[in-house]
Amino acid sequence: MGRNSLCPCGSGRKFKKCCASKAQEIGNFPIQFLKSELIRKYKIRFKTPEDINGIRKAGRLALDSLDMAESIIRPGITTEEINTVVHEFTAKNNAISAPLNYRGYPKSVCVSVNEVICHGIPGSRILRDGDIVNVDVTPILNGYYADANKTFFVGTPGPDAQRIVDITRECLRQGMSMIKPGNTTGHIGWAIQSYAESHGCSVVREFVGHGIGFEFHEPPQILHYGQKGDGFLLLPGMVFTIEPMINIGARFLRILEDKWTAVTNDGRLSAQFEQTILVTENGYESLTPFD
């Protein structure tokens, strides 16, 4: 393709006056051209500074919701009580809980205890000393979505609980450390899988991270396993979640009769942490930052 050819981004302009004029490049391709290809082929929706600010505000509300949940977690409460507190807090802040009625999900929050990997439906289950409990929140604030979750200790954790939570939190950090323009989603998955398996744990493969911001789930999918170079190229303006689910035993799972709750097949512990991430010009920014 010559510089006087029509730009392949579809603008109708000559390449030299369109994508070739952009200063930033990855692999000899202008970033704007690479973005246009991802938009055209995979419907990835890049975010403007205004969008990012809106998602960041929703992200702050997500973190405040998790803090609210943490403040009541103790032995003796039910998972339904966590749902009620977060639902009311979200509504009080003029936001909507995205999970409620999403594809038929009946609650505002996912609350997953011990062997529950994800999508635990809040109800009458009572938290007990030594449990671990994941709380997953997704507020919609002024039309923007943000997604975050944490796994909390209930009372005093045992050795296995401490181990799986520490390893899972570090898996998220390892995945985030791979985020920069020019890397791929496969770099993220590789880092998570490598760390988990090197510590004798396994990565759940049936559930993935995802684009977010304008909708609850957008392209691309972010696998928590894989190889460097696999998947989609990371480019500035992408916003997606990383949410590794790590099992202390085997990675296999089953879905309960409610058609939502995923549990470890061997009944052993599973933990998860999640943040909403923006790819920046030089790396990344968490829009739901926590340690």
Briefly describe each language-model feature range.
Residues 11-13, 22-291:
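Active-site neighborhoods and metal-handling regions in enzymes and metal-associated proteins
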Residues 1-16, 20:
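Short Cys/His-rich zinc-binding micro-motifs
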